[in-house]
Amino acid sequence: MKKYIFLLIILAATIFTSFTDCKKDEVNNIENEHEIPIDIEKPDVVIKPIQMWIDAHANLSRFSQKSSITSYLKKMKETGFNEVYVDVKPGIGYALYDSDILPPLTKWGDETVERDWDYLAYWIEEAERLDMKVIASLSVLGYGYTKTKEGLVYEDDRWNGKTQKEMPDSSRPDLVVDMRDQTNVDAVMLNPAIPEVQIFILSIIEEIATKYPQLKGICLDYCRWYGGRYGFGNATISAFEAYSGVTVNNNNQIITRIGGIGPLYKHWIEFRSMTITNFITNIRSKVKAINPDLELHLWASADWRSRYIVGQNWASKKYKPTGSSSIYTDSYNKTGFADQIDVFSLGAYTDKIWIKEDPNSVWTVENFVTTYSDFTRGDCDVHGSFASYAYGNDQEKISDAVYLCLKNTDGLMVFDISHVINHNQWDAIGDGINRVYKK
């Protein structure tokens, strides 16, 4: 009997011990579930597009050799850039790519550069090797250089009557001056209200998009009227009459003899903006038909309230301006083109960085990069851009401008590499980038 009792005690002890061990394992497993792992996998930081602009005129000789392109692309990469805008059809109207439509750009003023290689193709090739992207930029409507009378519009009678014309003195409304005869403008610009002009430019964009499928995008620059008094030739007035249904008997119906706002002014403003927007829409259709993944970019001044003068309503169609009923029609919002571009390069080109420097003005980098969404309403990506020449050797300002643009928008563009080189701004740009990514 005692033997059986002893065996029962041993069995009970074994069961209890096993039960206790199971409970300990269960507790340990629960505790292990809540242990903090030693190696935490951090989420990937999304690096925004950080772009350098390569102006054709300022860098014509600098990039006459392949070795220079390679060297500076490496410098850009080391600084933090991952994309580059390459100006391939500047305002003189010649090509820096392999074109069957435009003459090659070999001479500009006193500079002469001969190449037996494809300029744009080499930028793309070297950028790809460094895991960088290229966007081809072009002066959309610029086709002549007034200071030396060089360019397409000076060589071909085809463009007679198709350039923009200025009414310089509203007290003499019948006097209009062809841009080709002026010397104080950046470029002679073709008239976007003329169908032949649009067809010609579309063919150039089609050529670039077709020949260079490796491009990330195409950027439109100078896609506008040159200024508020440009566009008063017969061709534009006729197009305005057809658009608005009004008859213009005198240009002073648009701008008065003393330079004020005439009774047709706001209708004129809508027409000019709609002309540009329809043109951009046509460009988008052409680009996307060739390559749906090819991005359409556009650069314009960040000061939206002054852009009506040149027909650039870069806002969303959802944005309706308030006030200024003498400037904007009730339907002006339909001229917004933010939904027709993929990327808007927001030109915050001003010497003031912080709002506190000039609190009563919109003209600060900080203001522009923190208020743009009021206008674009999310219709496109926006990259803050600044003019590096405005800050010279002031390293702090350069770093601040980079920081504000990159921190507050979808990307950054620095204009332009010639000023970055001349003022040795590389370290300051790198510092601004690192402030955003806290390296």
Model-derived segments and their meaning:
Residues 42-63, 136, 141-210, 258-265:
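Active-site-adjacent "subsite" loops/lids of carbohydrate-active enzymes
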Residues 79-115:
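Aromatic-lined carbohydrate-binding/catalytic grooves of carbohydrate-active enzymes
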Residues 14-45:
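Bacterial Sec-dependent N-terminal signal peptides
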Residues 54-63, 101-116, 184-202, 262-277, ...:
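The substrate-binding groove and active-site-proximal loops of carbohydrate-active enzymes
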Residues 327-439:
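Substrate-binding cleft of secreted/luminal carbohydrate-active enzymes
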Residues 143-146, 219, 228-229, 290, ...:
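Substrate-binding cleft/loops of secretory-pathway carbohydrate-active enzymes
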Residues 96-108, 142-182, 220-257, 309-320:
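Aromatic- and acidic-residue-enriched segments that line the glycan-binding/catalytic groove
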Residues 67-94, 213-216, 334-346, 408-412:
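Catalytic domains of carbohydrate-active enzymes, especially glycoside hydrolases
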